[in-house]
Amino acid sequence: MKAAVIVFPGSNCDRDCKVAIERSAGARVEMVWHQETALPDDLDLIVLPGGFSYGDYLRCGAMAAQSPVMKEVVSAAGKGVAVVGICNGFQVLTEVGLLPGALLRNAGLKYVCKPVELDIVNGQTRFTAGYGEQRQAVMTVGNGEGNYFADEETLDRLEGEGQVVFRYKENPNGSARDIAGIVNKGGNVLGLMPHPDRAFDADLGSEDGAVLFRSIFQSA
């Protein structure tokens, strides 16, 4: 089992993701700098971590989406490799076109950092199958631009095709239809604002993030 964590200038959750994956799933994790033009071979998972890539200049995730390594990430996603974008990583996935919609400033115009309760809307994805009968999860958000937006037609399609994976029980940022995480149509690309990398050990207040990481490798 093998994963890669992409590191951009300004990433600050890359090491969190590495430790979370190693401890949750026992996978080998390689850190990949944004200027690389090739990914490690035989990857089961690629993670775009949280943080403030390129200082959030221009627009959150916009500059990271133009990094050389992202061409390889898009190519790997097209071949079915699992890709997870967490927080800033979710923003990058929308900027590069792997997921629809955009992440806007929080409705309250403030940075929000706190544990949130999530409904597991679709438990049949490769990211959520490990939750079994569990229908709620607790993870932590930490963002100023976590307000998911898409037009009504796109939102209807996401809901109708089972692409909404996580939904906030109490919306912290104004996200359309309380959406916290979505997958692409192929089911192998997940973007979510809550941090599974901050919920992989009981000492952190929740182990629900560990379930997500294990699910990925169990389905690989």
Curated annotation (Swiss-Prot):
Gene Ontology molecular function, alphabetical: ATP binding; glutaminase activity; phosphoribosylformylglycinamidine synthase activity
Pfam families in alphabetical order: GATase_5
EC id: 6.3.5.3, 3.5.1.2
Annotated ranges, domain Glutamine amidotransferase type-1: 3-220
GO biological process: 'de novo' IMP biosynthetic process
Subunit comment: Part of the FGAM synthase complex composed of 1 PurL, 1 PurQ and 2 PurS subunits.
The protein's role, per its UniProt record: Part of the phosphoribosylformylglycinamidine synthase complex involved in the purines biosynthetic pathway. Catalyzes the ATP-dependent conversion of formylglycinamide ribonucleotide (FGAR) and glutamine to yield formylglycinamidine ribonucleotide (FGAM) and glutamate. The FGAM synthase complex is composed of three subunits. PurQ produces an ammonia molecule by converting glutamine to glutamate. PurL transfers the ammonia molecule to FGAR to form FGAM in an ATP-dependent manner.
UniProt keyword annotations, A-Z: ATP-binding, Cytoplasm, Glutamine amidotransferase, Hydrolase, Ligase, Nucleotide-binding, Purine biosynthesis
Example of a GO cellular component annotation carried by this entry: cytoplasm
This protein's pathway: Purine metabolism; IMP biosynthesis via de novo pathway; 5-amino-1-(5-phospho-D-ribosyl)imidazole from N(2)-formyl-N(1)-(5-phospho-D-ribosyl)glycinamide: step 1/2
Protein name: Phosphoribosylformylglycinamidine synthase subunit PurQ
Keyword Ligase among record annotations: yes
Species name: Caulobacter vibrioides (strain ATCC 19089 / CIP 103742 / CB 15) (Caulobacter crescentus)
Catalytic activity from the UniProt record: N(2)-formyl-N(1)-(5-phospho-beta-D-ribosyl)glycinamide + L-glutamine + ATP + H2O = 2-formamido-N(1)-(5-O-phospho-beta-D-ribosyl)acetamidine + L-glutamate + ADP + phosphate + H(+); L-glutamine + H2O = L-glutamate + NH4(+)
Cell compartments where the protein resides: Cytoplasm
Active site: 87, 195
